Amino acid sequence: MLSLKNAARNGLASRFDCICADVLDIRSVTTHGSFDCVFTNPPYLKNNCGFRNADPGKFAAFHETTAGIDGFVAAAAHLLKNGGRFCAVYRPEYLSKLLFSMESRDIRPKRLRIVYPSQDKPPCLVLAEGKKAAKDGMITEKPFYIYSDNTHKHFSSGMNAVYERFSCGSSRLVNNND
C-alpha cells in the first residue's frame, strides 16, 4: 500500500494506522468511535467529468466511482471518537458540499485553508478540519501558496516550511509515486 510505503520511508510508520477497505463498507471492518483522527483526500470528480484515464485505479483515484464526499464523511463520522479530528483535502468548487456533509454528520468545521498554486492563480484545493460532536466556531486560515511566483519553479516559504516540518530529520520528504 502506497501510504504505508511512504510513511516507512519518511520515518512515520509508527504514528498512524491505514485501513484498506471500501469506504461504503467501513462499518464491517472497524469499531465505531475507535479513531482520534481521520484524514481523507477523496475522489472529487463526477464519473462523466474530466480526463478519463484508461487505468481503472487511476480513474477511481480522481472520480467518484462508488462514493461521493457524503460517503467519506459518513465513514469518518463512524470511525471518530467524540472530539476526534476529521481532515480533508478537497476541491474549492465543492467546498459547500463538503461543509454541509460534515455538519450533517455532527462533524463541526473548525479550520479552513484555501490553497493556491501561486498568487496569480485561482485556488486549487481546500484543507478543511473538523471535530466530531464539537461546538460551533471555525477559523479561516490565511491563504497558502505552493509556489512563490507564476513560473512554478520555486516553492513558497510556506511550502518549504511544510517540507522542513515533516522531513523528520531527512533533507526532504520522499514521495513514492510508484
Give residue spans per PLM region:
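Conserved Class I SAM-dependent methyltransferase catalytic core
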Residues: 65-123, 127-128
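Short glycine-/acidic-enriched loop or helix-start segments at secondary-structure transitions
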Residues: 28, 49-50, 98-99
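SAM/dcSAM-binding transferase cores
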Residues: 123-178
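Short, glycine/acidic-enriched loop or turn micro-motifs at the edges of active sites
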Residues: 25, 44, 132
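Class I S-adenosyl-L-methionine
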Residues: 1-4, 8, 45, 99, ...
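Mobile active-site "lid"/loop adjacent to the S-adenosyl-L-methionine
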Residues: 33, 37, 42-71
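Conserved beta-strand termini and adjacent loop/short-helix elements that scaffold enzyme active sites
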Residues: 21, 112-115, 149
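S-adenosyl-L-methionine
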Residues: 2-36
